Regions:
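N-terminal, membrane-interfacial amphipathic/helix-forming hydrophobic leader that caps
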Residues: 1-105, 187, 237-276
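Active-site His/Glu-centered metal-binding helix of metallohydrolases
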Residues: 165-170, 174-175, 202, 237, ...
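Alpha-helical membrane-inserting segments
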Residues: 81, 85, 89, 117-128, ...
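Core segments of transmembrane alpha-helices
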Residues: 75-79, 157, 165-172, 214
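Functionally important transmembrane alpha-helices
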Residues: 189-198, 204-263
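Membrane-helix interface segments
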Residues: 102-107, 152-153, 183-190, 204-205, ...
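Membrane-interface helix/loop boundary segments of multi-pass membrane proteins
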Residues: 130-145, 166-191, 220-227
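Juxtamembrane helix-loop-helix connectors linking adjacent transmembrane helices
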Residues: 61-66, 90-163, 181, 251-259, ...
């Protein structure tokens, strides 16, 4: 009965969304396809993230996953899927956040929030390490994404762009904007931030907490600006700043992987001493 009621409520909401005008039945069908496709995409990405986290417990990657050409191609394809889902939803572009009104304002606001968030997460990382003797991000994950050279840092900065675009299109544009006719905006922000945090499972428990907080901030920024541009900029700046800070804490570029691993061990020396 509960499932039947849920589907009945979905049907009523879809009818409200597509009320009036010719082709109403077709619009209803396409919105249902949009909802199903978006949920399927979320489940797919969730499953692959969970599988990656399990794999990392048994097998150590020898290269930076952000620089994988195969992964980059998949991300670009998924970005196309997100755009396609938004296009068939029947919703106006403002609802999806696909607007560029006051673009400079959004760029500046997103950059400022991203800078503040990145610094805040860095402070949280230091507090977690000093007070609890653990790390905000798992050691394995940190060692994988840390640039080995200055040149690699620039490649990672470029590789982050499609990562951020994909995550913001899915979690803010589709799951908040696209589902806003079905559920209250505040509830969507909470739900998406929790899922967004869970998808950062490879980063460890505290990494999930940090990502959930960031997801909530990006969601609120999306609602405030009615655009996905500002949260995209904030997301990118925050991620890049965190990588930059870790890179500099490791005494700058390293020509080999063992050098970077030595740097990570040096960062952990204080917390290990505290445990002893």
């Amino acid at each position: 009965m509960g499932m039947l009621t849920a589907f009945g409520g979905l049907g009523a909401s879809v009818r409200r969304i597509t009320a009036g005008g010719a082709g109403r039945g077709e619009r209803e069908s396409m919105y249902v396809v949009f909802v199903a496709g978006t949920l399927a995409l979320t489940v797919f990405i969730s499953y692959t993230t969970f599988a990656t986290a399990m794999l990392m417990r048994r097998w150590r990657l020898t290269s930076n996953p952000l620089l994988s050409k195969a992964d980059a191609v998949v991300r670009l394809m998924l970005i196309g899927v997100c755009i396609g889902l938004g296009a068939i939803s029947g919703l106006d572009y403002r609802t999806l956040g696909w607007t560029w009104e006051n673009a400079w304002q959004q760029l500046l606001l997103g950059g400022a929030i991203g800078l503040g968030l990145g610094l805040g997460l860095h402070v949280l990382s230091q507090w977690v390490r000093n007070s609890m003797g653990t790390r905000l991000y798992s050691k394995t994950f940190s060692e994988m994404i840390i640039p080995r050279t200055q040149r690699e840092f620039y490649f990672i900065a470029a590789a982050l762009i499609p990562v951020v675009i994909l995550e913001e299109l899915l979690f803010r544009s589709l799951l908040i904007g696209g589902f806003s006719p079905l559920l209250p905006a505040w509830l969507l922000v909470i739900l998406t931030s929790l899922v967004f945090g869970a998808l950062h499972l490879p980063q460890g428990a505290w990494g999930i907490v940090g990502a959930s907080i960031a997801g909530a901030i990006f969601g609120l920024l999306f609602l405030f600006e009615h655009s996905v541009l500002a949260p995209m900029v904030a997301h990118y700046v925050a991620n890049l700043l965190q990588i930059m800070l870790v890179f500099r804490l490791l005494d700058g570029p390293h020509s080999s992987k063992p050098g970077a691993e030595t740097g990570v061990r040096r960062l952990e020396a204080g917390s290990n001493a505290a445990e002893e």
